[in-house]
Amino acid sequence: MLFRSGMDRIQGFCDTLALHPDYQIIGRADSAGQLEVAMPQMDRLLEQGIVPDAVMCLNDPSALGAMAALQEHGLLEKTAVYGVDGAPEAKSMISEGAMTATAAQSPIRLGQITAQTVYAILNGEDYEKEITVPVELVTKDNVNGYDMDGWQ
């Protein structure tokens, strides 16, 4: 089951692609955000003859699962793989050149904002109903500027 943020992430990706006719979605699979689900789902798509140029995953564990399937089929080096989270494992894969990028979230910042919002609610203060927290795209060009063992 996807949470609203996951559904919004997927919808935003699809909406953005719809604005660019050079790109098309050739396959979709639900990984439930889990590596162990993403790998067989990606394998199934590949066995159906769906060979992507790029794979956009719900999160970094899904990206790692998709990468494992692509590797088994000899396609990882030919496929751009994107994840979301900025997980240490994803940053390591980016550093090694196996993964293309991850949109790094900051669990620390998310926790701070959540605590501030709960505090405001409990004190009867005004609070933002919708909060956007910026992310950073981690690529091979900037991955060394991040803590490889931790989160942002």
Where on the chain are the PLM-derived regions?
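Flexible loop/hinge segments that line or gate small-molecule binding clefts
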Residues: 76, 85-100, 138-151
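Short beta-strand elements at the ligand-binding edges of bilobed clamshell
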Residues: 28, 96-108
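Hinge/cleft segment of the Venus flytrap/periplasmic-binding protein
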Residues: 1, 5, 16-20, 106-152
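A general structural signal for well-ordered alpha-helical segments in protein cores
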Residues: 10, 63, 111-115
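Conserved beta-strand scaffold positions in the cores of enzyme catalytic domains, especially
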Residues: 25-28, 81, 102, 130, ...
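Hydrophobic alpha-helical
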Residues: 12-13, 24-27, 31-92
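Extracytoplasmic "Venus flytrap"
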Residues: 3-8, 59-60
